[in-house]
């Protein structure tokens, strides 16, 4: 008697993995194919807590979404994050946990300087999107929030909780807008509507960045996504994922395995048939 096989999940392109491949093909391989573990940064944990708290906030009736309620959701949000990754309970010291939660509350307080969540209801929060493009490229990702106006216009919203240093701010904004256009293309092909507005909410800086794409721009960007996926597939067939040294290497946790730093990557496991979002 043969044991049942797990259902095959098609490899797909996500905003983060597309960014990895553009930054460094070898980094893409380490993250998407080798699945090498990476310790979560405090910034990532803080961001996860804030996102979870906002998701819980918008699940409440609009009249209940006051600042005091948002702040009270920080601890339950931390519990939700730890429930997904139980090892964090042991890895994060109590003092660090308290610091993270304090910073998360400060970010949520800042959110109310940008929007009033009691005045509207989003269509969805943390919405999973998946769509196949005309050439077979599969896009997959999660959108922080989708708002729909009474007249039908879409607004795509993403919360940014980090604060990039001045020398990296331009790159951070470029990556953020790449992500938003990715979601805009996915929603265009899913719903047949060009999002009227892409909104980035920088909670640490109390800044809002709005952008209105047009159809021609998204069609060009769609071709860019197709080209990235074709390049990934080509590298996947041969295992030729080369490092691309840059200033960003300073933040990479895989330098000991990188040829650019005298390391040797693990044997290439081959292009996976059933791994998650690439």
What feature does the model see in each segment?
Residues 18-19, 23-62, 101, 105-109, ...:
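Nuclease catalytic cores
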Residues 8-10, 25-38, 85-87, 162-166, ...:
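Short amphipathic alpha-helical segments and their helix-coil junctions
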Residues 20-28, 48-49, 66-87, 193-203:
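Short, compositionally biased low-complexity segments
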Residues 53-125, 132:
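A non-catalytic, helix-rich entry segment at domain boundaries
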Residues 26-34, 51-54, 83-84, 158-163, ...:
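Short acidic (Asp/Glu) and glycine-rich catalytic loops that position anionic groups and cofactors
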Residues 127-225:
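Mg2+/Mn2+-dependent nuclease catalytic core
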Residues 1-7, 13-26, 129, 143, ...:
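Anion-coordinating catalytic cores for phosphoryl-, nucleotidyl-, and glycosidic chemistry
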Residues 12, 68, 151, 184-278:
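Metal-dependent nuclease catalytic regions and adjoining charged, substrate-binding loops involved
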């Amino acid at each position: 008697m043969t044991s049942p096989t797990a259902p095959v999940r098609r490899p797909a392109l996500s905003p983060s993995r597309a960014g990895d491949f553009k930054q460094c093909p070898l980094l893409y391989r380490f993250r998407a194919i080798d699945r090498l573990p990476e310790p979560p940064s405090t910034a990532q944990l803080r961001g996860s807590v804030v996102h979870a708290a906002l998701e819980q906030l918008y699940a409440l009736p609009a009249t209940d979404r006051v600042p005091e309620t948002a702040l009270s959701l920080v601890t339950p949000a931390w519990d939700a994050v730890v429930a997904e990754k139980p090892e964090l309970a042991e890895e994060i010291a109590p003092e660090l946990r308290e610091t993270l939660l304090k910073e998360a509350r400060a970010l949520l307080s800042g959110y109310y300087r940008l929007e009033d969540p009691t005045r509207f209801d989003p269509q969805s929060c943390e919405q999973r999107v998946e769509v196949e493009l005309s050439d077979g490229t599969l896009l997959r990702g999660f959108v922080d929030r989708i708002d729909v106006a009474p007249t039908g216009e879409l607004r795509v919203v993403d919360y940014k909780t980090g604060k990039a240093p001045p020398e990296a701010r331009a790159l951070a904004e470029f990556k953020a807008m790449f992500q938003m256009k990715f979601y805009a293309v996915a929603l265009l092909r899913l719903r047949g509507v060009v999002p009227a507005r892409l909104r980035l909410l920088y909670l640490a800086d109390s800044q809002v960045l709005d952008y209105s794409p047009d159809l021609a721009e998204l069609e060009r960007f769609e071709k860019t996504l197709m080209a990235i996926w074709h390049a990934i597939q080509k590298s996947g067939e041969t295992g030729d994922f080369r490092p691309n040294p840059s200033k960003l290497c300073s933040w990479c946790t895989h330098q000991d395995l990188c040829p650019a730093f005298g390391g040797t990557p693990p044997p290439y496991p081959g292009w996976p048939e059933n791994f998650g979002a690439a």
